[in-house]
């Protein structure tokens, strides 16, 4: 029987890469050129307890890899691969250096409608759309970048929507003698086959110019990133958010959070008689303070 891991190996081989089994971690795939480690994570747990044990084992492997190689492996989960196949394949190739490159200076930012943002995020963000107040799109004005590898097809046309960022409405609270307006950066995504150099920063500046926030917070999904890009933008890490337990529908591979304190049977998928569970790796909270105010 073909496995999820076999599917990744077959895809990489068809794309001209030579994936092999890593000598230290049998679960991990190694690609020599460029040197990258890929960690496939199957969705096979039939109870929350089993999913938690699997998550702890995955975290252990990731930590060992980081300690020995200084490299964060690319984590590929089975549900994402099967539910968002095109996006995940493009992301995988991009991490291996096969992507198109454009520069934010050759793009313009403008507000976009709810439907446009939702459609783009549905295709390009792991968690799709989310409730928000502000929606911005980055559109290509002219393409003066390059293809990072051959075989990427035609350059994008002027006017192409290449990235989207969304922000919440303001939350207000009193800090000392100031009323602070704090916003959440809820989503950012670019076309998965694309690298937009300076894209996040340009979208952030557009929001700051319009909303004039005192404070912006966001979360880095530790399944994908440890948040270095937020630090480059001036955000400071605050705390890690606990991992979330999901049930996964094996027919559609959709994740649904299992609410805290729920009984295991409440995660049952109607008509299947089978439960699958996955525990993610949590997230890291970041904050950008644009107005000085006391922390307490």
Model-derived segments and spans:
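Active-site/acyl-donor-binding loops of N-acyltransferases
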Residues: 219-293
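A conserved beta-strand-loop-helix scaffold within acyl/acetyltransferase catalytic domains
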Residues: 87-91, 96-214, 220-228, 232-233, ...
